[in-house]
Amino acid sequence: MGDWSALGKLLDKVQAYSTAGGKVWLSVLFIFRILLLGTAVESAWGDEQSAFRCNTQQPGCENVCYDKSFPISHVRFWVLQIIFVSVPTLLYLAHVFYVMRKEEKLNKKEEELKVVAQTDGANVDMHLKQIEIKKFKYGIEEHGKVKMRGGLLRTYIISILFKSVFEVAFLLIQWYIYGFSLSAVYTCKRDPCPHQVDCFLSRPTEKTIFIIFMLVVSLVSLALNIIELFYVFFKGVKDRVKGKSDPYHTTTGPLSPSKDCGSPKYAYFNGCSSPTAPLSPMSPPGYKLVTGDRNNSSCRNYNKQASEQNWANYSAEQNRMGQAGSTISNSHAQPFDFPDDHQNSKKLDAGHELQPLAIVDQRPSSRASSRASSRPRPDDLEI
């Protein structure tokens, strides 16, 4: 019999990417089929044709009777069976190698993107995210481990189905050709035999024992395939019931505005207010409102330049409104809410109309505020 080492090395690589049932199936294939076929079975069928004798001297009669009784040798039939049931497993191994090759390409591309981000400062987060999604799709985990999911899982299930089909097909073919037992005497009536002759088989009982043993091994392999198929199927159903979702498809809703970032009636945001808050009454022409970064999620970090510009605009507005003799609306008279200052609002009497309060600024005043601070206004409150 030929050398089985090449096939054995290929099938041995499948062990790392198979389930427990698949590993048991491979062990049965190696020990009870390949090893037994290469040692005991081959020696039992070594004299198969030479020891086949018929009670006639007609030349060629023994050959045609042997061909009629055994269209294919049992040993060669079992070799074909082993090859056919191993092909689906080898195809699954080819898919695993394809995934590993994809992993190498994705890792190389990921390293290149990281180098570009470090040298040029480019934003490659989206590209890295796409690479992670592809790795998850192919079933690639950290440290080069391949997990059975997606297309790889489907290939594994298909390989189990084909192995089961081949097992059943070869069992039926064997039963149809010569059954599962051998007789000591075979009757043959075929040209060029002059009449019906009797032919005798060498060691029929020993060969029958090996046939039954190989039959049991085939049935065990078929049972392992069916058990593994149900195991993979129910495990997939169990994972779906548990609600294991894709980590790269998490549901994220819109961020809700912070509750302690000021009242929604103000038209400024203080760096963190919700952009959907209702606006205050329209500001006078030329009123430039400088806001902080809306994307900042913390209410403690403010843009210093924006705060100074807001105070300058507020002082200029008070100066302009004081010269015109009009009062400032309540929406602009409110002091800006800075959480770091922790300013408490003042309570007014119910009979007095709400008027703008004078604000004591601890910071340096701008030019506009310094000119307007010395001018009295008729709507100032006495404190």
Curated annotation (Swiss-Prot):
Modified positions (Phosphoserine) in chain numbering: S5, S256, S258, S263, S307, S315, S326, S329, S331, S345, S366, S369, S370, S374
Cross-link type Glycyl lysine isopeptide (Lys-Gly) (interchain with G-Cter in SUMO), residue numbers: K145, K238
GO biological process: adult heart development; ATP transport; blood vessel morphogenesis; bone development; bone remodeling; cell communication; cell communication by electrical coupling; cell-cell signaling
Bias kind Polar residues: ranges: 318-333
Location of region: Disordered: 318-383
Main location per the UniProt record: membrane
Residue ranges of the TM segments: 24-44, 77-97, 157-177, 209-229
Known function: Gap junction protein that acts as a regulator of bladder capacity. A gap junction consists of a cluster of closely packed pairs of transmembrane channels, the connexons, through which materials of low MW diffuse from one cell to a neighboring cell. May play a critical role in the physiology of hearing by participating in the recycling of potassium to the cochlear endolymph. Negative regulator of bladder functional capacity: acts by enhancing intercellular electrical and chemical transmission, thus sensitizing bladder muscles to cholinergic neural stimuli and causing them to contract.
Subunit: A connexon is composed of a hexamer of connexins. Interacts with SGSM3. Interacts with RIC1/CIP150. Interacts with CNST and CSNK1D. Interacts (via C-terminus) with TJP1. Interacts (via C-terminus) with SRC (via SH3 domain). Interacts (not ubiquitinated) with UBQLN4 (via UBA domain). Interacts with NOV. Interacts with TMEM65. Interacts with ANK3/ANKG and PKP2.
The protein's name: Gap junction alpha-1 protein
Source organism (scientific name): Bos taurus
Gene: GJA1
